[in-house]
C-alpha cells in the first residue's frame, strides 16, 4: 500500500510541476461565452484593471444577464462531476452593494453561487455538497469598497482556499462539492435572477478554471503545493474502488469454489427419469404407443403412426406384448379360420369327447387338456369356452388371468373372455383398445363450459374456470361478481368502488389523489417544513411549526415553552430554539440545551477587559469592573482595540458605522445607533426602517410578498433583510456543538448531536478509521458497497462503523 501511495504522489507532483500555463480547454471565460458587449442591455464596456481583456460596468437593475440553454450546457459539461476548480474575477464593487457575482442554480438549489455583501462586509460561497444539502461558507472581508481587487476561490475536494490580491486570506476544510447539475439549470452573471442579487460595479476576467490550483493564472508567482486535496481524495477513491473490485472478486471466487464442490458431489449429465428408468440426454425409447426422447432433461413424446406390415405366406399382422404396432406373426389355418401362434381351439370329437388343438409352427397340433377342477356353481351357470375343454362359472374373472391393457386402458370381463376398454375421457390408439390417449375436450369442442368461463383440459376430463371478475355457480357456469358489494376489491379506504362487467374500478374520493388502489390526501397549498398531509387540506406539522400549511414557526422563547438558565438568552430558530450564553459568559464545553453550561468569563484574567493602566480590573459575574487603587486619582479612561479612549468619550466603530460606543469609567459600552425617523438627516443605511421610498421596498424570493426597507425574515435557513431595495441574506447562526455524529432534522436548519452514526447525515470523516465488511475486506470511511449475498442491501463505512440498509425501490425492481 505504501508503495502505491508513493507512486501516486510522484505522478501528482510531476503533473503539478509540469508548468504554470493554463490549458485553454480547462478555462471557461464567462464573458466570452456570454458574448457580452456594448449591445448587451444593462451593462457597459468600460476601462478595466488592465487592457488585456474587456471590463463591464454592471449598474442598471433592468438587466437580465442569463446564459442561453446551449451556452449553459456547454459550460456545465466542463464542470459536471468535477471536484477541483477555481472561480476567478477582477472586480471593483460599489460601496454598500450586496450582489451576486456568479450563480448556478436549479429551482431552490444553489449548486454554486458567489456573492459579496457590502451590508455585512463579507463574501459568501453557496454550494451543494455531496450529501445533497445546501452549504454556505462565509468569509468576513470588505470587498465592496469601490476599489480594484483580484479575487479567486479555489475548491479541491474538501479543501478551499481564498485569495484576494494574490494573498491567501482564508483556507478551510469544507464538505465536498456536488456539481452534478441537472438539465434546465440556470447560469446568471451579476445577479441571482431577474429580481434579486444585483451586483453593482465593474467586473473583468470572470473565469472558471477546471484544474488544480487555478489561481496561478491570475497570480503566477503564488506557490503551488503537491499534490492537491482533490488528488489525495482521488487516490483514496481509487483505493476504495480497488477494494470493491477485490471484494467482488473474492465473492465470485468463493461462489465458484462452492459450486465446484457441489459439482464434485453430483451427477451432472442431463438425464430424464421416467417410470423409474433413467435415460441419458438425446436417448430415445418406446413408451407404449409413444416414441420419447430425452431433451434438455425433459422427456418429449409423440404418438406413433402405425402402418400395416406386408407379411409373407404363413404370417399375418398381429399385436405383440410390449409393442404398439402390429408385427408379422406365424398363423395356422383350421376349418377355414386363422389362428395365431399359441392360440387354442376346443373341438368336440365324434365320441363327444373334448379335443384341444394349439397353433404351433403354422400347424394346429393336438395337445393334452389340463385336468378340470370342480366348479362351485350350478350346472346352469356353466359356460363352455372355445379356447379350452374346461368349463368355467358364469362371471369368471378372466382379467385376473392376465391381460395386455396398458396406458389409460382397463381390463373388462365378458362372458367368455377379457377385453380392453379406454377409460372415460380417453380414446383408443388401436382397435384392441390396449393403448389409449387423452381426449382434449376443449380444443375439440366436446365440453359443456358456458359463457364467462374458460375451458381447461385435464387428463380424462376438463374443467370450467371462471373469467376474472366472475363467480362460479356450478361446474359449468359463472356469473358476474360484484367485488364492491362483497368487499373483495382492491380499492383504497379513501376511494369509491364502482362495479364493472368482469371487474371493478377504484376512484379516489374528493380531496385525495392516486390511482384508486392507493389514495393520498391532497393539501391545496401543500405542507411546508416537513409537514404531512393527513386529510384533505389538513397538515400534521412537525414539532416547532404550526399553521394550516405548517408555514409558521413556533417561537418557543416568546411563547414561554422553554426556560433558559439565568446566564443564557433564548434564541428562536426555525422549528427549534437554543439557549445562548449572555455577554460575559461562555459555554464550558458541555453544550447543555437549557444554558446550564454557561459560566462566567474572567475578563481580567483573559485580558478581555477595557480598563486603562491606572485602574485595576475586578472580575464580576457576567462582567467586570475597573477600580481605582486606594489613594490614587484615576482617569477612568478605557482601552478599546488597542487605543485609549477617554472617560466620557463617544465614537463610531471603524468597521460598523451603525454602532456607537462610549467610555464610562473604564468600561466600554457599545450599542446600535438610535434611529430618529423624524430627523431628515438620519442615516438610512443604519436606519433602513426610516426609508419611506417605494423604490427601497424588496420583493420576497417567492415573488408573493413585499417588504419595507429594514424588514427581516427567514428563508431557506437564511436570515434575510431588505436594505434600500436590496435583499441580503446570510446563514442563520447555529449553536456550537461538539460531537462526532450529528443530524439536521427535516424542516430545521441547525445540526443536533446523535449517538447512532448510522442515523447521522453530517460526519467528520476520518479515513484512518476503517470497517471490516462481511467478507473480511477492509473498507475506508466513506466507501459504500452492496452486501455480499444480497442485491438490495447497501452498506457504508461511517468513521469505523458499518451501516447497512435495504433499498425498497431496489426490492420493487427485482
From Swiss-Prot:
Q: Which cysteines are joined by disulfide bonds?
A: 399-411, 405-420, 422-436, 442-455, 449-464, 466-478, 484-497, 491-506, 508-519, 523-533, 527-539, 541-550, 557-570, 564-579, 581-598, 604-617, 611-626, 628-634
Q: Which residues form the VWFC domain?
A: 270-329, 636-691, 696-754
Instruction: Give me the glycosylation sites of this protein.
Output: 51, 223, 296, 515, 613, 633
Pfam families, from UniProt? Answer: EGF_3, EGF_CA, Laminin_G_2, VWC
Alphabetical keyword list: Calcium, Disulfide bond, EGF-like domain, Glycoprotein, Metal-binding, Repeat, Secreted, Signal
Q: Where is the EGF-like domain?
A: 395-437, 438-479, 480-520, 521-551, 553-599, 600-635
CC per GO annotation: extracellular region
Gene Ontology biological process terms, A to Z: fertilization
- Annotated positions binding Ca(2+): 438-439, 441, 457-458, 461, 553-554, 556, 572-573, 576, 600-601, 603, 619-620, 623
Classify the source by domain of life.
Eukaryota
Q: Where does it reside? A: Secreted
Q: Which GO terms describe its molecular function?
A: calcium ion binding
From which residue to which does the signal peptide run?
A: 1-19
Stretches assigned to the Laminin G-like domain: 53-226
Keyword Phosphoprotein among UniProt keywords? no
* Function as written in the Swiss-Prot or TrEMBL entry: May regulate neuronal differentiation, polarization and axon guidance.
Oligomeric state and interaction partners are given as: Homotrimer.
Spell out the protein name for this chain: Protein kinase C-binding protein NELL2
Give the source lineage, highest ranks first: Eukaryota, Metazoa, Chordata, Craniata, Vertebrata
